[in-house]
Amino acid sequence: MRTTLTGTASVLDTTLTRLIDDVIENGSSFLADDENLQHYKQHLSHLETASKIALLRECLCVRPPLPLLPEDLLQNVDSILTRVRQHKILTPIFSLSPSRLIKHGDLGATRIHLWRGDITTLTGVTAITNAANSQGLGCFQPTHRCIDNIIHAEAGPRLREECFQRMQARGKELEPGEVLVTEGHALFASSVMHTVGPQLKRGASPTETERRQLAKCYESILEALELLPSDEDGSKSIALCCISTGLFAFPADEAAEIAVSTVTSWLQKHPSTTITDVIFNTFTQSDTEFYSKLLGPSHTKSISPVENTPQGSLSLAREWLSSADAVLVTAGAGLSAAEGLDYHSRDLFKRNFPGCLKFGLTSLYSVFGFNDWPSEEHRWGYFFTHLNMVANWSNTPTYQILIPWLRNFGQDAFVRTSNADGLFLANGWPKEQLSTPQGSYGYLQCLNNCRVDAVVPSAPLVADAMPHIDKATQKLMDPSKIPLCRFCGSKMSICVRAGSWFNQAPYQEGEAQWKAWKSRVLREKKNLVILELGVGMNTPGVLRWPNEDLVMRSDGRVKLIRVGMGPEAMVPWEQEDEGLSTCVQGDIGRAIPLLLE
């Protein structure tokens, strides 16, 4: 069932149609296939809101600054970006606790902070930094997950237009260490400091010249900030990203040392500075660890949700949850990632599976579909290590908040998850109120699926095998510990939906419990709220689309709250306009306390 487009939902489709025509007319080295673009244009009504936002950003990313976009189209984009950002969890600068103070005698002090998060969601900050390229126009490759892309996507096309005008006025490219200052446009920060750091070859050690160039970036940023007016409250602050450490390949640990020492030295040499706050902003866990060693750990003060987040979607979601008769939690990979069990994390894989790096594997996700194991001993060395790691995963603060809250609903709460990690059970949620349609690490199965009962519990086999796994190579050294089907003797694997061989038998009881629970709740006409956590687009037919369908077929008695990172967290705007769905965009680990406590 589809509803009529209203408000910003209609504006989004109209804007996308015009942008697609613009990209086709003006050409693009990246979105060069006109047929694909025409296909998108003809089928916009069938795309999810999340997909439309992603397509909008791609079109704007690849678009050259000339010809200038018409003002009415820019205003449409502004309204779309405004709606998107109303759903974000924000971090006010006043919620940060300083790691250190740089005192200036009787003139006060500059607070130094360390904060990990999305730099575009920091509020109350005068300026943020952008690790730019020498052209100063942003990144034109939408697949690059660089901060240049992120900042331009959030600021909107007016930022590229201003960058172009300022670069034209300069008449030359930016050199390493130079800074270009622009307005923030659709960003929360009033200004952006675009700087170009030194670019190294991957794996190379920086030269003394490159070290000086990186230091110059931070000096130039502080000098440019000094020239800006203070904010209304008298503060003047800058959020500093990790310059040159991504695609520019500057070693992250050395870059952190240069950043901290340069900023500290500059502030000490300028006791009359008007800069009140400097925030070292990190995005990865490894970068955070480097800065923590230099500055001390980061802290965020405990402040009320009203102060900490936008009023719109978060307040509405809290209201729905507080008045719900029943709650269905549907959880995807984003919930596990929020607890540190991130299947895309290179740091996690390198730390826990060093013996598997030589096979070209870089993350837990990269193992999906991997069949080039040298032997079964290597394959099961990995699987047993993986299962043991997950079974002993103890850092689950989100579950520690979520599950006690869910228990308040008694039999009117249910959990349905595509995660196989078993963390709901491990944190005390009853199996009678749990459905895992994609399988579970709790069982191993015959790869031939020779019989319905060709499954075995995994925990005893893991415990028996772990003493025989070489800690360096992570190879299973005792071949007798390799599990084989007790019926046909064939290979076995974890019992998850990874191929046509998947044995669903161990999970049929959970599916029956889910169907019975849903039928009862709907029959009793309870006000049901679906709290969807970290469900993306990898397998939308399992949780995401059924949730939306249930909302549309409920005559207003079922509402959906979608929580997650990035555009995938968006709900259909048509449903949102009807007051049936909303979303909270941000880290689930931060969202759950704000929603439930």
Swiss-Prot record:
UniProt keyword Membrane, yes or no: no
Q: What's the effect of swapping residue 144 to Y?
A: Loss of hydrolase activity with PARP1 E988Q as substrate. Loss of zinc binding
Q: Check the record and name the Gene3D superfamilies matching this protein.
A: Leucine Aminopeptidase, subunit E, domain 1, SIR2/SIRT2 'Small Domain, TPP-binding domain
Q: Which residues bind ADP-D-ribose?
A: 118-119, 133, 146-148, 244-246, 248
Q: What is its EC number?
A: 3.2.1.-, 2.4.2.-
List residues binding NAD(+).
333, 418-421, 438, 584
Quote the catalytic activity from the record. 5-O-(ADP-D-ribosyl)-L-glutamyl-[protein] + H2O = L-glutamyl-[protein] + ADP-D-ribose + H(+)
Q: Residues that bind Zn(2+) 1, according to the entry?
A: 139, 144, 146
Which keywords label this protein? Glycosidase, Glycosyltransferase, Hydrolase, Metal-binding, NAD, Nucleotidyltransferase, Transferase, Zinc
Binding of Zn(2+) 2 occurs at 446, 450, 485, 488
The residues covered by the Macro domain are: 99-299
Give cofactor(s), names only: Zn(2+)
A single Gene Ontology MF term assigned here is: hydrolase activity, acting on glycosyl bonds
Record's function text:
Is probably a bifunctional enzyme with ADP-ribosyltransferase and ADP-ribosylhydrolase activities. In vitro, can act as an ADP-ribosylhydrolase that hydrolyzes ADP-ribosyl-glutamate bonds. It can remove the ADP-ribosyl modification from the human mono-ADP-ribosylated PARP1 E988Q mutant, which is primarily modified on glutamate site with only minor aspartate contribution. It cannot hydrolyze the ADP-ribosyl-arpartate bond in ribosylated S.pyogenes GcvH-L.
Q: How does it assemble?
A: Monomer.
Q: PANTHER family, per this entry?
A: ADP-RIBOSE 1''-PHOSPHATE PHOSPHATASE (PTHR11106:SF121), GANGLIOSIDE INDUCED DIFFERENTIATION ASSOCIATED PROTEIN 2-RELATED (PTHR11106)
Name the family. In the N-terminal section; belongs to the MacroD-type family. Zn-Macro subfamily.
UniProt protein name? Probable bifunctional ADP-ribose hydrolase/ADP-ribosyltransferase
**Where does this protein come from, organism-wise?**
Fusarium oxysporum f. sp. cubense
